[in-house]
Amino acid sequence: MRAPDFWRKDNAVSRLLAPLGAIYGWAVRRNLERAEEYRPAVPVICVGNIVVGGAGKTPVGIALARRLIAAGVKPHFLTRGYGGTEVGPRAVDLDRHDFARVGDEALLLAREAPTWVSRWRPDGAVAATEMGAEVIIMDDGFQNGSIAKDLSLVVVDGSYGFGNGRTMPAGPCREPPDQGLARADAMVVIGKDRRGLAELARAHGIPLLAARLVPGPEGADLKGRKVVAFAGIGRPEKFFASLKQCGARLTADHSFPDHHPFTRADIEALLAEAEANEALLITTAKDRVRLPADLRARVAVLSVSLDWDAPSLLTPLFDRIGVRA
């Protein structure tokens, strides 16, 4: 789904829908209060957000896993496998599973560390622990009360913040921001803070970890090159901006709904457009796993990684949960 414009800036429509948003936020709070938490035998780091889609949870989770692995700690990812049919608990096998089975995010995470798909998260946590996980990194699930979290990081896009600040359907928030931040241990802000997020973090007494998304090494080859870009992610404009940052010349850009299952017709039409413009067809790593397998080699990818402004700020957070990293 594409976010309506009024999710970014308050207007008459969002105000009209505000009572429904209040009910939604109340339901989230009630479910959390009534939930019976399962506490795994190992620490759980939740990488979540308050708004729907596009905050940057996956790069944050990958960055955390890489730091833990470098310190000799064995992290496992736990995800519900959004967009896939797998109920789990199931360990993701990159040789056997595709996005239709386990979801696109699980395929990206599994390149970095063992990854479990489980609709009922406690079952996935048990499986991960039995298979040697020393830390569980939970992808999303900040509003899920079925599993106890030892460290909760709320990921926020610096330019979007919490949109108009209202709860769905009146705004992009899964719950009122103040309600969510009251449970958070830290806020991760990706990109320049244009929404007063530092002040909000201070008001809630939590640290702010600033970070930015850095284009992968393949970006160096894009300078001056004509490209036709497409993406089906939460905020495709961020991907298009990254291409321009690399010096690419965007002949066209196409936005698809988040998690869009690309058809052969979709990609063949885009390939034809790129050929007609003597341009390179390019997408994101997350989108690539949803392309027809035999067409992937014809589509370039610009990857991104997370770069912390002050990596040392992670140390006290890890110390708090007894992890040396």
From Swiss-Prot:
Q: Which GO terms describe its molecular function?
A: ATP binding; tetraacyldisaccharide 4'-kinase activity
A biological-process GO annotation: lipid A biosynthetic process
Q: Which GO terms describe its cellular component?
A: plasma membrane
Q: Which Pfam families match?
A: LpxK
Ligand binding (ATP): V51, V52, G53, G54, A55, G56, K57, T58
Q: Name the pathway.
A: Glycolipid biosynthesis; lipid IV(A) biosynthesis; lipid IV(A) from (3R)-3-hydroxytetradecanoyl-[acyl-carrier-protein] and UDP-N-acetyl-alpha-D-glucosamine: step 6/6
This enzyme's EC code(s): 2.7.1.130
Which reaction equations make up its catalytic activity?
A: a lipid A disaccharide + ATP = a lipid IVA + ADP + H(+)
UniProt keyword list: ATP-binding, Kinase, Lipid A biosynthesis, Lipid biosynthesis, Lipid metabolism, Nucleotide-binding, Transferase
Q: What HAMAP family does the entry give?
A: LpxK
- Family designation: Belongs to the LpxK family.
Q: What does this protein do?
A: Transfers the gamma-phosphate of ATP to the 4'-position of a tetraacyldisaccharide 1-phosphate intermediate (termed DS-1-P) to form tetraacyldisaccharide 1,4'-bis-phosphate (lipid IVA).
What is this protein's name?
Tetraacyldisaccharide 4'-kinase
Organism whose genome encodes this protein: Paramagnetospirillum magneticum (strain ATCC 700264 / AMB-1)
